[in-house]
Regions:
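Nucleotide-sugar donor-binding/catalytic module of glycosyltransferases
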Residues: 1-136
């Protein structure tokens, strides 16, 4: 509701927020330290308004290597498009962490059952090899 209200109040085409990171058991670790409206917004914390709908095809058409970094790819296209963006400096999503990387960043013990950290770096290298600007 907060994102939708912000979209209306700010007359924005796209609104984003941060996320609250949770352990596999659902208990809260805290706010995501990675959220930066210029560099990284998790897909779960993105709200596309009608003015940003024409960009949604980028999700479908991104190269296979891009899916691992799809949230950054979409943020790139949003920024390039010039649509009016607004970021709420608050958490709107509870994100259950199933990959080990976020546990390390939160100084948490890595629990059993989480996936190893994916090779994001390989995707960034492929993106840049295609002549696109760095997303890191």
């Amino acid at each position: 509701a907060n994102l939708l209200a912000a979209m209306e109040n700010e007359q924005a085409d796209f609104v984003s927020s941060s996320r609250t990171l949770c352990r596999l058991d659902g208990s809260v670790m805290g706010p995501c330290p990675l959220t930066d409206p210029e560099r990284f917004i998790d897909t779960n914390a993105m709200l596309f308004g009608r003015g940003a709908f024409p960009l949604l095809h980028q999700w479908v058409l991104m190269p296979d290597y891009g899916h691992l970094i799809g949230d950054r790819v979409m943020l790139h296209h949003l920024k390039e498009s010039g649509v009016k963006r607004h970021h709420l400096d608050q958490e709107s999503v509870f994100y259950r962490c199933a990959k080990e990387g976020l546990y390390g960043q939160m100084n948490e013990a890595i629990p059993e059952g989480v996936q190893p950290r994916p090779d994001y770096e390989a995707s960034f290298v492929c993106w840049e090899a295609d002549g696109l600007p760095p997303l890191r």
